[in-house]
């Protein structure tokens, strides 16, 4: 291909890592995006994770010195009708806009509280000499003068009526008719054609008609008149009619002087202003909090805010919104000032906030504007006016192209489709006909059909899109075949005689997920009543089955449950039970109970007393009728009503061959009230089976305790007991770092072992068990990391670190270990400062090859705040892209290990001694072996 033109540019997708150097400690992380919506106007969105939660900040950065930019007020045609900001932007042709002035929520037909000026003309406003609003309430006005200089001051305004340049009197307002008219009102044709509607409400008014600066008519009382296009009328209350009619006879040259003034005595004509929009109090002056009087609504509350601000030493202003929803925390005045200082603000003032806060802008390359923020209450409020941003330029010729792929990762034979957007030299959108776009390859191999690329060889492909002589390029990474397959969902529930759809992804060498074409996947099923074609599942009668997807020699399984996933087996409405029997230290009883009840009309209550003993104390219930467990069950569920007694709860399961299993429902009844608990059924149990007993026990009792526990609504969850790759992810199966076993290190190699809980409330380990576990964990290991707060006193040689639900970091050779507390549901909720400390440590880790982060929860699946978990993941992905480091997130929990690979980040769960059978030997740990820059791992049993 011939050499490409200078206009060819590759699209680079960026993810903001955050402003680590921020002086505001409350900001933990930032996700920032920017796009130019027209030359001179940039939309910035910044999602800030603070110690209070997330803040969603939208900023319209406007360069007033750019000749392409116009700022104008927006309102409805009548000035009284309320509209949402999106409608105002659409109707006025603006490219963006925010809400502006306050208004009377209790009235449906009233103007804004402040003045409104456009192009040197007062559209409407109250005379400050007679109004109780405006400067008398410390409510400021945002102005831009004819030299494009912005200001935010407590502007007063007066409206004077003059005859032959001699003052006759002052008008109470312009283009506003108050409920009671006590002074003259000036009305022009901006909003009214006649005075008929006004006279109908105020029948005693007199009217002077002024056209081309001359009085042309004096009306009778209550007479309606037309308002001249080149003039105005003066409505006069009956008490002042004689005075004004005498002073302003027909033929008199009349002028209306509209002047702004400040308390400093400075005055200027309205004609000197391009724009003026009222708002609330001044927020900042000279980069600091304003210390004078200022009207502010709920300054101490975290609410939605709209602000206009100027930027230090620049021609820029900012239109800023901060949202308040269930997902975003809003902001108070003190923190708002701190936020604005981040953006180098000089002066700032409030616009209306709360439910009125709205930010609308078109996206880059798009003609239609759209809502960009999340209004309080879930939908836009209709407001009285706004500030609109306009492009002064007409749509020009195409100058820039943006190419958007369905994916930047692909496999040979898979399709990638593209769309393009265009803008002119002023970054205004230019519509593009897809038929006018041609696609070609600057490097790599493949062929196009329209906008769809089919790569034919692995490697990097540089795609070039050309339209009207403008080119843009984008690189696509193509691999021959996936390293593994991922089916979503991995466990599918489907109703009988219905269909559902799988999505299958190929995992490439980077760990990225690439969607695969359904027609290229071969499916098989181990159940004749379940079939899959082109990723669509069809199911007939109730059953469970496994389906296998095959693609280019790679395969993966998914589970299908046809019919209900959870089935009630005994709600204990008729099944009775008896106490298991007293001992020297344990006494109790079992009875039916009608309160509390979770389901139906009764539950079973077991009351028991544990007396002090160093031996295990056990209380149990024997069901009169054993509870049947179906062949397709994978877990047994029950609702328990606890009293925070802290005892372990188990059930006894007897399989069809008579073998007994003791399955743990909960390690500790550390809850009060009803809670859903569940026990997985071991793979080796032969079903069908039956539940015969319910147990609670304590391994050690220091003080006598009498308590009770209630049982209700026993159910099963249908599925697969061997859940590897189905109930739990097993991405290690295609991970090149994973080995089935690891030899002990030699030479400069070293090993790090990481284990979950080594202590369990349900399990009393003797010294032999602890010694055996210590030996297993310590064998060949330079470092042992205990990734749980539940630990036995292990006898370990060498270096050991213990997760303590607080921030810690250690470096061993070329591996950095970072422990972050997450026990309260996430990093922020547990120890907010750990965010900045972890980021600072990670970004100063150029001397290590491996970063291992230990926490108690998987950020992507277990954080209470899913956005926080995703943000942490995205941050790690960006670090990996920049540095190429190996990054692992290891967390403790579950009854079995799990490995997830997400965009090159490995999330590994270690269950420690926790296992379905409650035998520590069935537990496991993660063994890592470092060999120079290479790292390998395996999952090893504790036995």
Predicted regions mapped to residue ranges:
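Extracellular beta-strand ligand-recognition surfaces/modules
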Residues: 636-638, 676-717, 721
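Extracellular carbohydrate-recognition regions
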Residues: 561-588, 720-740
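Divalent metal-dependent phosphoesterase catalytic cores across multiple superfamilies
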Residues: 724-805, 867-885
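Short carbohydrate-recognition loop motifs
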Residues: 594-618
């Amino acid at each position: 291909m011939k050499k490409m033109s200078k206009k060819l540019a590759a699209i680079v997708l960026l993810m903001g890592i955050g402003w680590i150097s921020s002086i505001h400690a409350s900001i933990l992380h930032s996700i920032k995006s920017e796009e130019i919506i027209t030359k001179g106007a940039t939309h910035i969105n910044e999602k800030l994770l603070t110690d209070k939660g997330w803040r969603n900040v939208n900023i319209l950065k406007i360069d007033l010195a750019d000749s392409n930019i116009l700022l104008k007020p927006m309102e409805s045609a009548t000035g009284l009708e309320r509209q949402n900001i999106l409608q105002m932007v659409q109707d006025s042709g603006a490219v963006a806009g925010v809400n502006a002035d306050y208004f009377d929520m209790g009235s449906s037909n009233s103007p804004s509280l402040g003045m409104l000026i456009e192009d040197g003309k007062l559209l409407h406003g109250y005379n400050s000499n007679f109004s109780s609003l405006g400067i008398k309430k410390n409510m400021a006005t945002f102005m831009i003068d004819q030299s494009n200089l912005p200001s935010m001051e407590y502007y007063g305004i007066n409206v004077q009526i003059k005859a032959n340049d001699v003052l006759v009197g002052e008008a109470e307002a312009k283009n506003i008719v108050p409920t009671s008219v006590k002074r003259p009102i000036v009305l022009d044709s901006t909003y009214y054609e006649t005075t008929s509607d006004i006279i109908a409400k105020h029948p005693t008014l007199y009217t002077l008609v002024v056209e081309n600066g001359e009085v042309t008519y004096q009306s009778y009382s209550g007479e309606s008149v037309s308002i001249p296009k080149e003039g105005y009328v003066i409505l006069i209350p009956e008490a002042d009619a004689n005075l004004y009619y005498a002073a302003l006879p027909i033929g008199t040259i009349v002028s209306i002087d509209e002047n702004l003034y400040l308390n400093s005595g400075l005055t200027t004509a309205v004609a000197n202003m391009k724009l003026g929009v009222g708002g609330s109090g001044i927020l900042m002056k000279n980069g600091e909090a304003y210390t004078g009087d200022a009207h502010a609504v709920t300054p101490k509350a975290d609410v939605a805010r709209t602000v206009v601000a100027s930027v230090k030493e620049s021609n820029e202003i900012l239109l800023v919104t901060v949202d308040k929803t269930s997902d975003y925390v809003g902001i108070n005045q003190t923190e708002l000032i701190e936020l604005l200082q981040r953006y180098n603000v000089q002066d700032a003032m409030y616009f209306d906030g709360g439910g009125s806060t709205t930010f609308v802008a078109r996206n880059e390359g798009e003609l239609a504007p759209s809502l960009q923020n999340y209004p309080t209450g879930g939908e836009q409020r209709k407001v009285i006016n706004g500030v609109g941003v306009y492009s002064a330029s007409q749509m020009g010729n195409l100058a820039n192209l943006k190419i958007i792929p369905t994916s930047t990762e692909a496999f040979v034979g898979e399709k990638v489709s593209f769309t393009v957007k265009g803008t002119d030299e002023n970054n205004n959108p230019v519509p593009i006909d897809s038929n006018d776009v041609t696609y070609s390859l600057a490097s790599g191999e493949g062929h196009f059909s329209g906008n769809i690329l089919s790569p034919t060889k692995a490697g990097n492909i540089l795609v070039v899109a050309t339209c009207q002589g403008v080119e843009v390029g984008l690189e696509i990474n193509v691999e021959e075949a996936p390293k593994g397959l991922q089916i979503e969902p991995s466990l599918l529930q489907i109703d009988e005689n219905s269909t559902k759809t799988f999505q299958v992804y190929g995992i490439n060498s980077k760990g990225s997920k690439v969607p695969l074409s359904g027609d290229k996947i071969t499916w098989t099923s181990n159940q004749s009543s379940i079939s899959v074609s082109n990723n669509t599942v069809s199911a007939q009668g109730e059953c469970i089955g496994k389906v296998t997807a095959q693609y280019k020699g790679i395969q993966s399984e998914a589970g299908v449950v046809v019919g209900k996933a959870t089935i009630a087996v005994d709600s204990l409405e008729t099944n009775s039970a008896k106490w298991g029997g007293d001992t020297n230290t344990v006494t109790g009883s079992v009875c039916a109970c009608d309160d509390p009840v979770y389901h139906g009309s009764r539950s079973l209550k077991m009351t028991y007393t544990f007396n002090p003993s160093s031996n295990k104390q056990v209380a149990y219930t024997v069901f009169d009728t054993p509870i049947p467990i179906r062949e397709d069950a994978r877990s047994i569920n029950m609702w328990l009503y606890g009293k925070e007694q802290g005892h372990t709860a188990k059930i006894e399961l007897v399989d069809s061959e008579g073998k007994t299993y003791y399955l743990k429902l909960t390690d500790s009844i550390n809850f009060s009230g009803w809670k859903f608990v569940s026990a997985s059924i071991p793979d080796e149990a032969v079903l069908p089976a039956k539940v015969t007993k319910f147990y609670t026990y304590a391994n050690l009792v220091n003080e006598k305790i009498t308590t009770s526990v209630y049982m209700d609504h026993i159910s099963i969850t249908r599925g697969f007991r061997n859940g590897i790759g189905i109930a739990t992810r097993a991405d290690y199966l295609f991970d090149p770092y994973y080995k089935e076993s690891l030899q002990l290190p030699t030479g400069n190699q070293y090993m790090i072992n990481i284990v979950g809980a080594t202590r369990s409330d349900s399990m009393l380990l003797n010294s032999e068990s602890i010694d055996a576990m210590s030996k297993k964990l310590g064998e060949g290991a330079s470092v042992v990391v205990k990734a749980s707060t539940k630990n036995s006193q292990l006898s370990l040689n060498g270096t050991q670190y213990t997760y303590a639900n607080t921030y810690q970091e250690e470096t061993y050779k070329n591996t950095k270990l970072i422990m972050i507390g997450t026990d309260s549901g996430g990093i922020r909720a547990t120890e907010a400062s750990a965010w900045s400390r972890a980021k600072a440590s990670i970004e100063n880790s150029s001397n290590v090859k491996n970063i291992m982060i230990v926490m108690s929860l998987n950020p992507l699946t277990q954080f209470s705040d899913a956005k926080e978990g995703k943000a942490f993941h995205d941050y790690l992905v960006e670090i990996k892209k920049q540095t190429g480091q190996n990054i692992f997130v290891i967390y403790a929990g579950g009854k079995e290990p799990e490995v997830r690979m997400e965009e090159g980040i490995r999330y590994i769960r270690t269950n420690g001694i926790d296992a379905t059978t409650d035998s520590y030997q069935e537990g496991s740990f993660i063994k890592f072996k470092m060999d120079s820059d290479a790292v390998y791992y395996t999952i090893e049993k504790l036995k």
